[in-house]
């Protein structure tokens, strides 16, 4: 416990500095900026924040949303400009100019963007599908902090092909990209560059009427690998750090509606599972509804009845050569919407290893693994005063029947999650959490609870312009099946800056910690995790943009007797990124492990318990720029592995034939030779995306791995009839590579169609 006492002492000593850094001053202290830019960018003024004024449209004005910015209102709206580079030439004016105009009427916020370009045909815009990542495209990002609290924000982005992406930002830069707001954008190209025209209904945003908002803008010119921002352009800042955002003023007397959204849906399915003893097709139809109501401008209630997840994308398979379960993220929209208000321990890099709430535990029976139908669920998320509030309650059915499987009788369950955070100072909070999982129908485990406390102190003004954070948590999970050692706790100090960054995390997960609605990768351990990294940027080098060196360390000790169980180093011996965005890196990974129990690593191969293993692996990775038509990422890894050796080869290919037609191909091969035996694993994945427009897409995903011997194919068609109204067609087919039949035999297949409609009041 000496390490915990040391970190606790450091946290206490740093707390006053963090608090002082967050105290409001008579004039905000700006980040240090080069004098050349102070003369060019209003953002560098030491006495005022950059401001953009939204222009109110007159009763006779309207906007035709076509992306052209030729409506009358745009001519009388004062633009925001003078963007400053964050990369590569930090602090210098952007090489391509950008202008942003904002207008509004009674019901909508309008944003007009002109991205001037000296090479009007040089833009890149491969992606069209909603919410796709944009590593290869030009893009324009804007973030809106409607409460001006510098903690939460709405994140939006578009590219020259009209792709629309959005997310909800939470504390610790948590980004919930599964949020789909109702808004519309159009893109257009011209001989001066490309333009955007955006309409965001005020009903989509939560805000207090009559108040100013925080806002910031960022533009990416992909062929130059250039990032520029309106404000907050220092490398320690960025578009997602709302403490460095500008001000949006002038929005007054607008309508937020009655705050009620009704989303009914209808779904039809056809399922057959011949590989599981049920070869007959089962045809079914169902209806359900989601209700959303804004109780206040900042607090939203959600009720779902007869919930269905037919449109959910499949998980991406992974090869697991460890003793511990893999963590798969949530993909169901009901649980993702507003999930930032239910996060615990935000910012902890290792919090996923022992989180008290993981919504994928809901709707899955623990004993049989049977999927359970969700009868209804309710949520309350948002802000009230200085509090962030998240409440969730879900009831599953008395009988679980995974579609296409034989009905397995299981007890229905009730799940309850409550989360409260009290905002402190400018960027900090203290919080509490409670979860409950209660069985119905006389199950052996009647009631299980988890309670937790956490805090986070954060500032972007440490030593005037540096980021510094301190965080901690405590969790206790009750269970009638064990007594004592049911807790988890941790402390963290972070210094995420440039060129130096570092972090120290300490945690303990006791042997009986088992959160009923959470996830614990490993219990009975203490973890010490220091991290340090340094980034060097050669000046005026025509080829190289940056070098990076660093080390991530994990020491894992037995929580009872402090025996060393694991010691892992991840040494970045060399990382080089070129201005072209091509990278190459070399890592050294020394490891030590004490096996506490027998480890069946592969069928017929078991590593015996109580053996000590020390080995070192090496990893060489290269990545070509994503903006290229063919982007390649090969990985080679070799070296020791337990009692022998392991070789790993992986290859990722991204083929962007033209805007809207993209192929992702990946393969991974592991060859393991141990004293106890040898084996191989293989993983293949192919994804073909046909994006007809920003409103219509078809995605085919094919995967096969030798660990499960299952070949899976999902075909997913989505048509956004209008924002908020969606039509899905999804087909899923799984085959088993049966060595006795020497062929692939069908396990199950399922076809689904789903129509969702949104009506707003």
Language-model features: locations:
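Structural preference for beta-rich elements and adjacent junctions enriched in aromatics
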Residues: 22-423, 432, 445
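Bacterial N-terminal signal peptides
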Residues: 7-16
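Positively charged n-region of N-terminal signal peptides that target proteins for export
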Residues: 1-6
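Sec/Tat signal peptide C-region and signal peptidase I cleavage site
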Residues: 17-21
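Membrane-spanning beta-strand positions in outer-membrane beta-barrel proteins
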Residues: 110, 195, 207, 261, ...
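Extended, hydrophobic alpha-helical segments in both membrane/secreted and soluble proteins
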Residues: 264, 285-291, 299, 305, ...
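Exposed, low-structure sequence patches enriched in small/polar residues
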Residues: 373, 461-468, 472-761
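Outer-membrane beta-barrel transmembrane domain signature of Gram-negative proteins
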Residues: 234-255, 397-464, 582-639, 648, ...
